[in-house]
């Protein structure tokens, strides 16, 4: 059954435009409260990133949940994976995150976690959607939900992150720069690394509600690259606005993406005989990652793009490690979802164990040239299905003679068509990608 409101990563859009409006959030809170309360006593955690609209939507959700008879525990600004963790540890029925992840401040969204800290099953999302289309009724006064605030949420999550590494871990002597994207990690991330002994320079940790992801964080790496070089740091770590993506910069200023991080983590677990099964990537994962893992004897499979698909594949195979080149990295041995701080800690641990720099660690993964271009798509006929586009993709695939890949897909979170071409000749790859992007642009017009 097709969902009306929920996309691949919850509900997301422009603030003030349906469905990202206060009245919809009120109804969504009520519908979610009714759905979860139908399963028994109901307590729901609500957290958010640092967008100014988060206050407005937090109040609306709080009112709707209470009207349905659900008790609410407010966490304030917290990373998305922290809300998943706290939902489990407080034995709540669900967790709600108010965030649009790596998008600018004028977007916002909602995503849910189950009581186990995992993505909601489709059947519960469909139940919520069905209730959204029903008349809103308020429970009698004696059954209204109560609202409280958890004041030590940050401290609890900081201790959890530190517990993901051995108690003897000490990063003394390691000089790092951390870019918090003026987002949800602005308090907890610097504390985690400092308390583990690292010398930390902090960037973009002064959120004002409007500057989240604004030329900073994992989608704008230039500031971090410059700071790593200026500070003569060993490496830099960049988070996105809600703390579920991480990218790094080595001491030379080179960007280390999700494929690199996934390889470093998987290789470390494999060498210590602690890798359960293989590794899950996505259709966008670089071919070089697949080949490098194969050289180590590590199985690799591709899921659809989106962390929920990576997680679903991991669960189906009972594997532990997966991720996307955008920086979503899942380590099931520690978490139930992608957690940027946890992933960064596992990389730092690997570097310490092998006594190598981040630049040295990434050299073992030889990537194929890959070009990704985005084409604005406002809706209407799917350009990927257009005969001319299909024919062009087939022509490019033939031209690369089995030495590359072509992938066109619609973004699940933004109005974009993503054009990816990968092969062993960078000039050829870029030319093919630009030609395909131009054709898709013409078709969209």
UniProtKB/Swiss-Prot annotation:
Which residues are annotated as active site? 101 (phosphoserine intermediate)
Which principal EC class is assigned to this enzyme?
isomerase
An example of a GO molecular function for this protein is: phosphoglucosamine mutase activity
- EC number assigned by the record: 5.4.2.10
Q: Which organism is it from?
A: Pseudomonas fluorescens (strain SBW25)
Return the similarity comment. Answer: Belongs to the phosphohexose mutase family.
What role does this protein play? Catalyzes the conversion of glucosamine-6-phosphate to glucosamine-1-phosphate.
Q: Would you tell me the protein name for this molecule?
A: Phosphoglucosamine mutase
